[in-house]
Each structure stands twice: as C-alpha cells, then as structure tokens.
C-alpha cells in the first residue's frame, strides 16, 4: 500500500476524533482500527480530498485514484458507518470508482436534502481545457441518470469564453433551496486570473437565465481599502454560500496592480 492513502485517510481519522473527542484529544478507539482507517482502493495511488457526513452519521470520503498517468484518474467515493466500517450496501462493498476525465481534482462533497450525493471538482482530458464538473450519486452510490449526462454535469466556459484560452478551476459550490447548484472558482490564465461562476439547475443543466447564459468570467468592479478604483485586478473566488433569500454570497481574493496592498479579500452578493 502506498503512503499517500495512509496519510490522507489518517487525516480523515483525525477529523473524526476531533468531532467526537475534542475535549480530550484522544483517538476514538471504537472507530476503525483504534481510531484510524486505512483503505486501499485498487492497489493504486489514492488521494482523499473531501469529506462529509450524512444525516444517519455515515461518513463519505471522496477523492481520486490512479494506477499511472497513462491510465488517468477516476473519482472514488467511500462510505463508512459510525464505527469506521465500509458500508457494504453502498457502491461495491462500500466504494465506487467512476471515470470522469483523464485528469481530475476533487474539491468538495456534500449531501442534498433528499439524500443524494454531490461531488464537485475540475476535470480535463489530455491537452484539453479544464472545466468545472458536478457528479451526482443516489444514496446507494449509483450515478443519478436524471442529472446531467448519466449523473455528470460540466461547465462550458471554454466554449463561451474561447478567447481566454484558460483552464477553469472549481474552488467551491453550494446548493440553494430549490436544489440549484452554484459553483465558483477561477480561470487560470497566463494573464490576470478572473473569477468564474456557473449555475446548474436541479437536473444538471446550465441555467441560461442566470448571468450570461448561466456563466460569468471576469473581475468585479471593486475598489480597494482606500476607496480608489482598481485598474487591473485579478479575482479568484474561493467560497460561495447560497442564502435563504435566493441570492448568493461569493468570497475570494483579489490582486490589485495599483494598490498599496497588493492582495485583499473581497465579498460580493
């Protein structure tokens, strides 16, 4: 077993102990193997990068697995019960592997109100532009075929903003009251990075009634802390929250070329 899976899943175990035993800082010995879980997915290099918990107390861990660059990566999701055991009624004995693209980075996993599972990240084929993606699974780990194409929804920034020739990196997403998905990140260009925002409907279709045909790439008209107009600014959205009034709160970092302090935080609604 490779060390990467040991380190990533050990971190998962430490999060578990902090939830249950924050007051003592001791391992929960009744969880996994004396408080630690080690899972080898397919004798491969595995990277756990997102974690959440469902309403029954089951823990879901998401990330990527690969046997080598030529074969590419796959999304994995593993589900554990509150004792740290793989849930055999989820996926294939507690684990699922799903091919999405050659290169994948998982950013977040979260639960829908109805028990469905959302996984978001960035994906691209070899020598192709990276795009946002959202994968939706049913509660048993099966891809939800009513969402996107066979459970997978992707952004189309490279088509709508072809002139930028950038990769689009997802940093966060959230779910609103109507199960719409709002996702934010940045285009990683050779020039100034810009905020990227997209909205998907509950069926995984880009909501063309939102902003500019469902998407936005650009820098917000932000003033710096001295209330001076920013001439050239680089904005990267790192967090989004869907508010109860139907609006979205987006936060991130901006770089300002004509400011005394180059880096500042921004929040827009």
Predicted regions and their residues:
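A sequence-level/structural motif corresponding to short, flexible coil/turn segments enriched
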Residues: 21-269
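Bacterial Sec-dependent N-terminal signal peptides
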Residues: 1-24
């Amino acid at each position: 077993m490779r060390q990467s899976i040991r380190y990533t899943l050990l971190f998962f175990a430490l999060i578990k102990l902090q939830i249950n035993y924050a007051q003592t800082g001791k391992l929960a010995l009744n969880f996994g193997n004396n408080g630690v879980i080690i899972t080898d997915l397919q004798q491969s290099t595995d990277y756990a990068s997102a974690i959440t918990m469902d309403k029954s107390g089951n823990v879901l861990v998401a990330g990527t697995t690969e046997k080598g660059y030529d074969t590419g990566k796959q999304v994995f999701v593993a589900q554990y019960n509150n004792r740290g055991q793989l849930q055999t009624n989820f996926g294939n004995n507690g684990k699922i592997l799903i091919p999405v693209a050659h290169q994948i980075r998982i950013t977040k996993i979260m639960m829908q109100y109805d028990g469905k599972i959302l996984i978001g990240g960035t994906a691209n084929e070899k020598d192709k532009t990276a795009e946002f993606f959202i994968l939706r699974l049913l509660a048993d780990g099966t891809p939800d075929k009513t969402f996107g194409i066979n459970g997978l929804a992707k952004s189309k920034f490279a088509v709508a903003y072809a002139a930028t020739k950038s990769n689009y990196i997802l940093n966060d997403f959230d779910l609103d009251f109507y199960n719409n998905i709002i996702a934010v990140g940045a285009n990683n260009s050779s020039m100034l990075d810009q905020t990227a925002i997209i909205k998907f409907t509950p069926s995984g279709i880009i909501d063309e009634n939102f902003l500019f045909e469902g998407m936005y790439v650009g820098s917000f008209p932000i003033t710096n802390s001295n209330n001076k107009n920013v001439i050239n600014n680089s904005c990267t959205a790192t967090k989004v929250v869907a508010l109860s009034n139907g609006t979205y709160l987006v936060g991130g970092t901006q770089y300002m070329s004509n400011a005394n302090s180059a880096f500042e935080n921004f929040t827009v609604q």
